[in-house]
Amino acid sequence: MYGGDEVSAIVVDLGSHTCKAGYAGEDAPKAVFPSVVGAIDGNGMDIDDAANTTEDAKESDKEKGKRKLYTGSQALNFRRDQMEILSPTKDGIVTDWDMVDNVWDHAFRNCLMIDPTEHPMLLAEPPLNSQQQREKSGFSTFYRC
């Protein structure tokens, strides 16, 4: 039975410890995973690294510039030489937008298994977020979705 208020809006909360994503109107988020990203600089990657990655890690990795980024519990728990665990936020403010895009992409594509262009989006943000951070967040979400 259709209640009339059922929309397929996606709610994303990128916290300093965990990222939570799910559908608006549901009691609990569908995806809860660490909001940290594993990063390997371009000079730290070797040929054997690509052969040792699991299928889940390959799906959630993204190469940005000269570093390879890994997001999600399975990708982070897989041992890789010279991988550094980094947080995209500091004191609740986003400091690395490439990492945030990687976290959002993991939430949409791997956890929720949706195309973000087909859903309205609600992003949680810190109450003391600056206007510049708010604009960057909206810009990034608008152009990637």
Curated annotation (Swiss-Prot):
Highest taxon, organism lineage: Eukaryota
Gene3D superfamilies in alphabetical order: 3.30.420.40
SUPFAM superfamilies assigned: Actin-like ATPase domain
Region feature (Disordered): 47-66
Pfam families xref list: Actin
Tissue expression as described in the entry: Expressed in roots, leaves and flowers.
Compositionally skewed regions (Basic and acidic residues) per UniProt: 55-64
InterPro entries the UniProt entry points to: Actin, ATPase_NBD
Xref: PANTHER family: ACTIN
Record-stated family: Belongs to the actin family. ARP4 subfamily.
Protein name stated in the entry: Actin-related protein 4A
Organism: Arabidopsis thaliana (Mouse-ear cress)
Taxonomic path: Eukaryota, Viridiplantae, Streptophyta, Embryophyta, Tracheophyta
